Amino acid sequence: MITPEKLLEAAKQLEPQLQEWRRTLHRHPEVGFDLPQTKALVKKALTEMGYAPQDCGKCGVLALAGGKKPGKVILLRGDMDALPLQEESGEEFASELPGKMHGCGHDMHTAMVLGAAKLLKEHEDEIEGTVKLEFQPAEEIFQGSLDMINSGLLENPKVDAAVMFHVLAGMPLPAGMVLVPGGGITMASCEQYHIVVHGKGGHGSMPNACIDPITAAAHIHIALQEINSRELDPAGFGVFTTGRFEAGKASNVIPDSADMWGTIRTIDPEQKVSAQIHQRMTEIAQGVATAYRCTAEVTFSDYCPCMVVDKPLAQNALTYMTELLGRGALDMTAITGGKPGGGSEDFAFVSHEVPTVSMFLSAGNAKEGYLYGQHHPKVRFDDSVLYKGSAAYTYMALRWLADHKE
């Protein structure tokens, strides 16, 4: 098998191509399941490498490397979708599409897995089994992973282990460092809520003839904060945030309704905290609405479970990343103390089906000029780390398959 040094050297030679892929994707961000240009770029690149890419689900792409020798199957995932965000990064290759931006680094992930595909194809005879390459849409809306699972992602051939990386910007870590978690729950579950308050609209000069849904919705929003501060166990992790509030179109019109949308995050595999939040949020919204002569509807959607990292696979990953990067690999528990984070990731659906490890790659810190974190309109990512990401994906696959021959 290729040595770590040779693999890093080969990956480094791909750097111009990796940056070209990434910057092309960055200029043309697409969101959700609507990724025609992104998907076309991925399939074209894979075909030129000698793969036969296959569609999976609404907009996913799969390709297989290896398979010439018997062995297990490892899945490498890169997500492809962008955010509905107006870019303010100042990059020369900034988004050319108003209101859309690769503000979470998925363009980086796609390029990294394409780089891994190139390296694996060049060393296909060394693969002791099969590597399944996954390019996933709709991670930002927590729907893409489940859609691909339901479309056969983990079958034909059946996946034995799964790996993903996520880049980090604006964190106090040198660019190019890989963080490996220790196992167990590492990320929170996530779901969305939508509260609609119905009143009776009319002229702003005659509130007495109306039933104002904005007033009711404002009081609902304030009342809901009692759940966070007074009802949830402070020793656990459960939080929700209303991030969007809309009502009316004109300043002199009381609207018929007001809407609130938000997110719920919990670290609770049994979903007891989620159930508590659901119950109390519904009771409070409907009760307060009634007090203000309104009615309220509360709905919950897009549930995504906690990310569960397989401990033996994580231990393998730390060993392999240390072999590849030396001190450039770090046990994440040294930073987190083993505590899960409040972020969410829909690859969690895969983690509940097969042993999974979710790692991180630092892509710039404040001292290096990368001041902002993910989902900020000014976030920037250091794409000089792309080759390390491609090498890490490749080495993880080669080493794990070699160590787990059937």
Residues of each region from the PLM?
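Acidic/His- and Gly-rich active-site-bordering loop/insert found
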Residues: I2-H102, D107, A111-E128
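Metal-dependent amide/peptide-bond hydrolase catalytic core
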Residues: A218-E406
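Histidine-centered active-site/metal-ligand motif
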Residues: H26-H28, H102, H106-H109, H166, ...
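General structural feature for long, well-ordered alpha-helical segments within catalytic domains
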Residues: T3, L14-W21, D34-A45, K72, ...
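Histidine/acidic-residue-rich, glycine-tolerant segments that coordinate divalent metal ions
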Residues: L83, G90-M101, M108, L120-P255, ...
